[in-house]
């Protein structure tokens, strides 16, 4: 699937999905480690905090500016079943994030619970992303106007706020040069200048998943 499959620009949506899958893979690898304490690594990792925050921003903004609006536009139509499924899938993910955080703070049984919870998160979120790409994006594309879709992007960016200089390189971490260039061409000129001038370099200095020896 590419952004050219739609009349609306889905490039950032697909980039967010790819970033979520990438981070899920990294989290799963940490949870499966036996040379360090995965619980300690995740509990203090910048990467875990960023993943949770950006995922919640994305889903909350979708719920409020996309699915909620589409419910009104598609009232009494069969497509509302798909909207209900999207919202239910979102609702199932937040409790898994909370359960993982609880396990990370559980000194007695957290290590035993962690791998199963991470696997449940990967399964739930992975299935949601696949479902949204298979059916949800096409429904968005056929229902929302350019202005309504632009509002989703604007609200999303506002919620990221001052962290945009970290958020954008995080999104594009491990993206191909071609895909990165495509995303950057869709930004205002200063966005590319900042990304190439300082944002990416500062992000590359971060050790998102560094193990720690404290706590």
Model-flagged regions — what are they?
Residues 1-215:
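Small-residue-biased structural context
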């Amino acid at each position: 699937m590419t952004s050219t499959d739609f009349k609306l620009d889905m490039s950032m949506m697909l980039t967010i999905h790819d970033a979520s899958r990438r981070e899920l893979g990294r989290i799963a690898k940490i949870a499966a480690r036996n040379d360090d304490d995965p619980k300690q690594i995740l509990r203090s990792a910048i990467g875990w905090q960023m993943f949770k925050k950006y995922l919640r921003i994305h889903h909350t903004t979708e719920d409020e500016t996309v699915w909620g609006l589409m419910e009104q536009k598609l009232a009494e139509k069969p497509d509302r079943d798909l909207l209900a499924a999207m919202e239910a899938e979102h609702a199932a993910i937040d409790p898994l994030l909370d359960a993982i955080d609880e396990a990370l703070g559980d000194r007695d049984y957290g290590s035993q619970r962690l791998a199963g919870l991470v696997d449940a998160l990967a399964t739930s979120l992975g299935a949601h992303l696949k479902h949204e790409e298979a059916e949800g994006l096409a429904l968005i594309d056929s229902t929302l106007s350019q202005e309504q879709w632009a509002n989703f992007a604007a609200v999303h960016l506002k919620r990221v706020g001052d962290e945009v200089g970290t958020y954008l390189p995080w999104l594009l971490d491990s993206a191909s040069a071609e895909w990165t260039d495509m995303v950057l061409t869709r930004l205002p000129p200063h966005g590319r200048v900042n990304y190439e001038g300082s944002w990416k370099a500062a992000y590359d200095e971060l050790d998102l998943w560094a193990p720690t020896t404290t706590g």
